């Protein structure tokens, strides 16, 4: 049947930096997971991906957000999303390998299925430029090595350029990755 097998939650920008009123972040994440689950249930199939995007702040030393604070921001969202019933964590549109690492560590620590006690699968995608570099300079092999070292379940590229410009980067991802490329 046509359609999507993975539904993403509408939580790309949801974090304590943007939603700091009492209970606001929790309500947003829970509603997003519930809405995605409803769509999957209506379709009769589908997994729910808790969608995590960049915090909107640069991490130190390039910016003012400490690494530990970034981990904490992501852990809060992942904890709420996992408790609400997300099936996996999708970290996407990352341009800083340090922030990407913070998000993955948070997902590993807080992304526990409350029913099974198992870690939720983690997918991670980044934004490369046409030279295969992140905003902060990391290249394809370095990002793959980091993500595979952190034991993500799948990795890939999204946004930033069109399909023709992405093709050489995707080919490099496929050449070096030992986990599924998304």
Can you name each region flagged by the protein language model?
Residues 1-182:
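Domain-level signal for soluble alpha/beta catalytic cores
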């Amino acid at each position: 049947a046509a359609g999507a097998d993975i539904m993403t939650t509408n939580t790309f920008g949801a974090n304590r930096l943007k939603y700091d009123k009492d209970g606001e972040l929790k309500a947003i994440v829970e509603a997003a997971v519930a809405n995605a689950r409803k769509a999957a249930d209506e379709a009769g199939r589908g997994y729910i991906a808790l969608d995590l995007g960049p915090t909107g702040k640069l991490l130190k030393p390039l910016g003012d957000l400490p690494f530990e604070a970034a981990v904490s921001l992501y852990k809060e969202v992942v904890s709420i999303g996992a408790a609400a019933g997300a099936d996996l964590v999708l970290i996407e549109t990352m341009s800083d390998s340090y922030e990407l690492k913070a998000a993955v560590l948070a997902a590993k620590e807080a992304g526990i299925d409350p029913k099974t006690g198992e870690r939720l699968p983690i997918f991670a995608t980044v934004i490369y430029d046409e030279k295969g570099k992140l905003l902060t300079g990391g290249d394809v092999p370095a990002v793959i090595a980091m993500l595979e070292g952190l034991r993500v379940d799948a990795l890939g590229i999204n946004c930033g350029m069109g399909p023709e410009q992405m093709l050489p980067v995707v080919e490099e991802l496929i050449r070096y990755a030992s986990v599924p490329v998304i």
